[in-house]
Amino acid sequence: MQAALQPGYFLRAAQLIEQALATDTARVLIGTGFPVGNTFETDGPLGAIALYQAIEKLGGNPLLVCGAPLADCLANDFATHKIALADTANREQEARQALDQWQPDLIISIERPGLNAQGNYCNMRGEDISANCASFDQFLNLASCPTIGIGDGGNEIGMGNVIDTLTALDIMPSTTCCDELVIADVSNWAAHGLIALLSSARGTDMLASCDNIAVLRYLSGHGSVDGVSRENTLTEDGLDSEISEQLIDQLRKISGFC
């Protein structure tokens, strides 16, 4: 996928965030939550919360957009907007109403399932997960503001930008596009990379207060599962939490903060 993207996508995405935060009233919608059975995986929400906290520190007004059960889990601790599960007939109207209500300056999708050519949502195993999936695609399709898509597998919102490359893979790729696509081995890591760039631009080490394991425990306590093992563990896509901690430390060093 990386070869299909114009180099500099991390920097361009970070610049879109900076531009959106130019006013004190800046509103950033962050869509996340990939369903696994009747719950959600750790990859996505972890990075979404990190972006939420960073945007808040920079004076923005972030809003997490997700379906049940994730929306209900986060509602007590974060500003959230809940979207309906499997409501195919009303998903465009739902998006229009939300966009009219919130008037976002930027929309970010991180590890959100994207509609495929058949009009369904599928996981990396090719299983149809539409019945448990809320639709965030129309938020990006109808947006009058810039949009960022973050993903790692090819079936996430934003991957329509590289659909010609993905058709050669044995997956059901997403056809939903975005203004700037950011990819990483784990979507959460892309969020940390963007925060590192924002930190460098502002001269503030925002990753220093990023307690990844604490948020992972928080999500686990609400029933999250690893997207690979489908088990309630403190892991991200089958990888131990220490790997993310090491990545965050490396990003801080690269940014010149430690």
Regions found by a protein language model. Give the residues of each.
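Short, glycine-rich nucleotide/cofactor-binding loops
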Residues: Q2-L5, F34-L46
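A glycine-rich helix N-cap at a beta->alpha junction
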Residues: F78-Q101, D105
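Short internal beta-strands
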Residues: G59-G67
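Histidine-anchored nucleotide/phosphate-binding helix
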Residues: E41-G59
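Structural motif
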Residues: R27, D105-L106
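Positively charged, low-complexity intrinsically disordered leader regions
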Residues: M1-R27
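Conserved mixed alpha/beta catalytic, RNA-binding, or beta-rich assembly cores of soluble enzyme
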Residues: G44-P45, L106-I107, R112-T204
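C-terminal functional extensions of proteins
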Residues: I157-C258
